[in-house]
Amino acid sequence: MKLLLDSVVLIDHFNGIAAATSYLSAHRPDAAVSVITRAEVLTGFERRAARKAARFLDCFPTLGIDQATADLAAVLRRKHGWRLPDAFQAAIARLHGLRLVTRNSRDFQPQRHRFVVIPYRL
């Protein structure tokens, strides 16, 4: 595992964005999702489609939130002013030594946050 997928990349995939699908296909063996990502992605689907999306998400290891993650997320939120889900994503990535794969370059500027990967732009 080398990468933590942010929800925006998976949502792009489900919305038919070819760049997202190509990236996921090329990096699937190295990628994981967080419980935050899973919840954010599945929220966008109706029940039947959510089951299909969940099966796709099941292809990736799912990383949870523990006390150390919560503590680091609080520090990162104070320091950077991130929304709590973004702070949790960053904390999970950092504690597991993963790169955070996102399209959210507004909050996660790769030149400022070296653990961030912006795989494509729309």
Name each model feature, range by range:
Residues K79-P85:
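Donor nucleotide-sugar recognition loop
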Residues M1-V33, L42-D58, L122:
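Short, well-structured N-terminal submotif of metal-dependent ribonuclease cores
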Residues V9-L10, T37, T69, F88-Q89, ...:
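Alpha-helix capping/helix-boundary segments
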Residues A39, C59-K79:
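Acidic catalytic patch
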Residues D6-S7, V41, A73, A93, ...:
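Generic structural signal for small/hydrophobic residues in well-ordered secondary structure
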Residues A90, R94-L122:
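Acidic, PIN/NYN-like endoribonuclease modules and their adjacent C-terminal/linker elements
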